[in-house]
């Protein structure tokens, strides 16, 4: 009798531990996936206004003067090219000065409006993400009740050994889930920090855009901006695929162990694809 009571007490202890571990694991996943969908669609100004203002002040007060010096050198070099390219001054035409003045005007206009151009790129990307959010994903959350059903009733019929094995599985997978949630955090916050770093030095590559020889620097910078902006769209697609996959877990039988490991596998896949979105976006836009 006493042994039976101890066994029942131990079974209840294991069942409570399993339910607690699974609930915490799925709540953690739901929170992190929700953060992905919520934060990748933000513009740099909306994500953190303090960092945004600091980066903007640095760009306008420190980087723009440097870009002005570079622009002066680039346009002087451009003028020399325009003059000597016509058969070493033998076919000299005065119209090249008007051409040079026009190119200089455009270059100055681009450099002085770099911040507006950069923010316009991210505004367009944010608009694309916002419009796609309702189509790609409606709910990426995992319903714990749908995954395990009436878990406590099911586990009551299990033996102590089976419960102990499931408890160890839930502890291990829960620990792995915490590690994966950190990986998700690194992807999302790392991308935003990269956005701020890239936008801070925008005037310098834009200062070279008008010149034929150096213009590839500015063009590659613009492609990098587009890649960073539309990386958010690729991330949303990853989350949408993840949402469809976990729906299969929610309706897949009564195999609790399979549901746990399936959830972990899909989360590992999500982290892997999130890390790949940066390189994929750059390759699509030809940035390097």
Regions flagged by a language model, labelled:
Residues 206-223, 251, 283-284:
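Alpha-helical transmembrane segments
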Residues 1-70:
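Binding/recognition "hotspot" determinant
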């Amino acid at each position: 009798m006493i042994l039976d009571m101890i066994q029942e007490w131990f079974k209840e202890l294991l069942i409570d531990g399993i339910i607690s571990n699974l609930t915490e694991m799925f709540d953690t996943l739901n929170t992190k996936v929700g953060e992905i969908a919520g934060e990748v669609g933000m513009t740099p100004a909306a994500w953190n206004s303090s960092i945004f203002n600091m980066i903007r002040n640095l760009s306008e007060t420190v980087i723009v003067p440097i870009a002005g010096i570079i622009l002066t050198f680039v346009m002087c070099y451009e003028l020399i090219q325009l003059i000597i390219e016509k058969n070493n001054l033998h076919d000299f035409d005065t119209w090249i000065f008007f051409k040079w003045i026009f190119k200089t005007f455009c270059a100055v206009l681009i450099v002085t409006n770099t911040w507006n151009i950069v923010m316009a790129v991210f505004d367009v990307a944010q608009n694309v993400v916002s419009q796609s959010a309702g189509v790609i994903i409606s709910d990426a959350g995992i319903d714990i009740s749908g995954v395990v059903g009436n878990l406590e009733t099911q586990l009551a019929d299990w033996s102590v050994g089976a419960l102990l094995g499931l408890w160890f599985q839930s502890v291990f997978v829960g620990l792995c889930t915490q590690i994966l949630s950190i990986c998700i955090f690194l992807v999302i916050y790392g991308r935003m920090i990269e956005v701020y770093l890239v936008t801070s030095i925008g005037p310098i590559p834009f200062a070279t855009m008008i010149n034929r020889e150096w213009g590839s620097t500015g063009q590659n910078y613009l492609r990098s901006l587009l890649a960073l902006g539309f990386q958010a769209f690729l991330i949303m697609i990853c989350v949408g695929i993840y949402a469809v996959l976990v729906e299969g877990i929610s309706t897949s039988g009564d195999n609790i162990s399979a549901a746990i490991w399936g959830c972990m596998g899909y989360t590992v896949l999500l982290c892997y694809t999130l890390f790949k979105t940066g390189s994929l976006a750059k390759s699509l836009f030809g940035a390097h």
